[in-house]
Amino acid sequence: MANASQCLDDVPMGGRWPAAPPDQYNEAHRLAMEELVSGGPEAMRGFLKRERLPSFLSEPEMGEILGCASVLPCGDEENSMSASVDCSSVTYFPDRSDVEPPILELGWPAFTTGSYRGVTRVDVHFQPSFGDTIYTCKEAARELIRSAREVIALVMDNFTDNDIFRDIHEACRKRRVPVYILLDQTQVSHFLTMCYNLGVSIETEPHMRVRLLTGNHYYTRSGTKIIGKVREKFLLVDGVKVATGNYSFTWTDGKLNSSNMLVLSGQVVEKFDLQFRILYAQSNPIGAKLLSSIRSRAMCLDKLPCKLPASKKPTLSSLLRMDQAKLSSTPKRHFDEFGAKFNRDVVALDKAAEDEWLQSCDIISGLKEMQTVEVQTEPWEGKNNVRGVDVGIQTSVAAANAATQTSVLSRMASTQTVMVSRSITTQTTETSQCTTQTPAPTSSVARLSNSSNSSSSSFSSTSITSTGSNCSMKSSDFSGTAFYQPEYPLGNCFKKLTKDRQYHYSTIRSKLNHMVSILSNRNRMPNSYMANDAPCYGLQRREIMHGSLLNLRDGVRFYPNM
């Protein structure tokens, strides 16, 4: 009979112990991590280049690892060894233990290991959804919480959703359902801030337990510890249903981000039951120092004075500035650049309104004063009057017209239309103020009829043509830059609107008069035909034609000689 040593010799090499899975440990990656922690990303890239290895970490991962790395204090291991009562740190644990995790202190559903929990069913939810409910993941989680009767167990990386927390707090306070919450250590401060804002103190809740959870720990030879994060997300309700997926209990995941959730029931829930108890045994309670710091910071934020901008009533100047910005060709320019110029425009607008009122008084009384150019047309009954007015133009010998601005003021009345043209000429002289007065040919012609309110006058580059009782401004050239303003004054805008309105009214009135005259002629036509008189048509005399120039534009009217 062969002995034990001979039996061992017959066994092939490596057959007694299982082979390690491939790629479970990589010495090159460990050395690269040492370089990253000690020298930063550049040192790690240099090491990978020397070893001719591809990079296995992205830029966000490098930043996350450096943010989680912390140097261990001296004597930390000795203190932890002496503080351990059961010497669990030096106790050997086999791969599979027959000892169950500890029972949770608030109670747990009475399911033994391997007990039947029903047929496994899966409900899949995607968010955003295109069905009846858009936010299906959030609604599914809230429905599970409302249906809880025995226990609510939650493992989450980030928990800041107010609606879901209110549902959990209501189940804890009103229905007395035990609640266990395990959160990532780096995100628990945000959860505590949310609780304080909602007026909930978790340390005084008798049916709620909140604990901290971390990922795996990685130690380097230089004494640096890298702590991983929690990425597990599942909600266990009554030990029979569980919701899991990439959906986090935050407002952004509930409204903005796309996510999915699986609602599982049946025998598969046993795996999540065991996993939660393992994680709860590995978790740590929240320290009193962290609670006090969160509370003090929230109180400081509440005491800060909230200075709201005083609401100001819109004034006339602010409204005018807004209109000035709208009319400007470059509205994005700062208003201060046009502040002084805008104030001058407002004063000039008031002065112009006063001058216009005085001019209207002069028109009524029949008096008219012209400063530079005088063109006045008066309608006379039964005849046309054409009047030419010499226009004086002042020019300098040394320099010609430097800047010229022409403004036209128009007044429309029932019997008279007055055109006022003002020309402002600036001149530059080198040695002497030598000027000459040169008469210019007739530049304004007024055409009148027996009952019309039209006038036509033109001066320089301003041409005004009036047909019927309407006036239309053709063109107004502003040469030079001395009087050029980039903003259109508000007063001119209202003047233009009034002129356009009067133009439309006069057009309608002239058309109505034309239609009345046509209808009156039609009434005379049957009488002529009934009398069997051959009508003789001839040109209407110019003296008794209708006063509206619109009839001349439409065509010459004929009528039977009576």
UniProtKB/Swiss-Prot annotation:
It is found in: Cytoplasm; Cytoplasm, Cytoskeleton, Spindle; Cytoplasm, Cytoskeleton, Spindle pole. The keyword Transcription does not apply. Residues 424-471 are annotated as: Disordered. SUPFAM superfamilies: Phospholipase D/nuclease. GO terms for cellular component: cytoplasm; cytosol; mitotic spindle pole. It comes from the Eukaryota. One of its GO terms (biological process) is metaphase chromosome alignment. One of its GO terms (molecular function) is protein kinase binding. Gene3D superfamilies: Endonuclease Chain A. InterPro entries: FAM83 (IPR050944), SACK1 (IPR012461). Pfam families: SACK1. Residues 425-471 have a biased composition (Low complexity). Keywords: Cell cycle, Cell division, Cytoplasm, Cytoskeleton, Mitosis. CDD domains: PLDc_FAM83D_N (cd09184). May regulate cell proliferation, growth, migration and epithelial to mesenchymal transition. May also be important for proper chromosome congression and alignment during mitosis. Belongs to the FAM83 family. This is Protein FAM83D-A.
